Structures are given as C-alpha cells and as structure tokens.
Design a protein with these regions (language model features):
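Alpha/beta enzyme core
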Residues: 2-4, 37, 42-44, 49-144
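N-terminal basic, low-complexity leaders that serve as flexible interaction/assembly modules and, when applicable
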Residues: 1-47
Length: 144
C-alpha cells in the first residue's frame, strides 16, 4: 500500500505540472485514475455503437441491446468511462452519475446513407456535455 501511495503521489505531482486548467486536470484524473484500471490507462466502453452500426450487431448477444445492461457492464466490468450519445446520456446518466464517467459523443453516423458517404452530423454540443457532467467529449472523423 505504501508503494502505491508513493506512486500516486508522484503521479499527482506530475499532473499538477500539466498546463491544464484545474477542471481539465480533474476530469482527466477521474478518467485515468478514478475509475477503471486506475493506473493511467483508459478503458472506454463504446455505447455509441448502437447508432453507428444498427441493431443487427446485437443479434449474437440479445441482452446487449438493453442500455441498462450496457451501463451495468461498464460499472461491473471496471471500465474507465462510457462513450455515448446525448439521448442515452440524458435518459441514463442520472441513475449512473458518479458510478462511471461519461464521454459524450458529439457526432455520429448510421448506415443510412451508405458508408460511401462520410456524413457524420453533429447532434450534441460541448454545452450538452457540461450540462450532463461529461468528463470528455468524443468526435468521430472519417478521413479519405
């Protein structure tokens, strides 16, 4: 325990030297050390994939279509955070607030139109992320 306390102290000292605001440093600390492996690694459960891929991806594991199942998986599986869209965040984060950090996806795409079109419209804002208590935002870019 003493060794881990010393390591945590050194990590905390390094974090205090980052050129980030207190709020950004706090949110980053929560993601890297407050949840999940707690060793500086980030393990994110991407709950935004239902939008990105559609319901057919859930056929092999029917319980996975239930958002509450996915949230429980994130908490019980010791993930650092979950990534999801604004609709699911508004519906479920009240119940899971403080139990798993939120990375709010600002954009996303569906398989309509086809993958030939790299359309990924914005459907949430940084203001939404702040309102929902997100520790970070996610933005997907399709290059090429």
């Amino acid at each position: 325990m003493i060794q881990s306390t010393q390591a945590l102290s050194k990590t905390s000292e390094r974090f205090s030297k980052l050129a980030l605001s207190h709020g950004k440093r706090t949110r980053l600390w929560r993601l890297l050390y407050g949840h999940g492996p707690r060793n500086g690694s980030l393990l994110v459960l991407p709950l935004d994939q239902g939008l990105e891929h559609g319901p057919t991806d859930f056929f092999p594991n029917p319980p996975a279509i239930d958002p509450d199942y996915q949230f429980r998986l994130a908490v019980e599986g010791n993930f650092s955070a979950i990534a999801l869209g604004v609709g699911l965040a508004e519906k479920y984060m009240g119940e899971y607030c403080g139990r798993i950090p939120l990375i709010l996806k600002l954009n996303g795409k569906t398989n309509i139109p086809s993958d030939a079109e790299a359309t990924s419209p914005l459907f949430a804002s940084v203001e939404d992320a702040v309102r929902l208590g997100a520790d970070a935002v996610g933005y997907t870019m399709y290059v090429g």
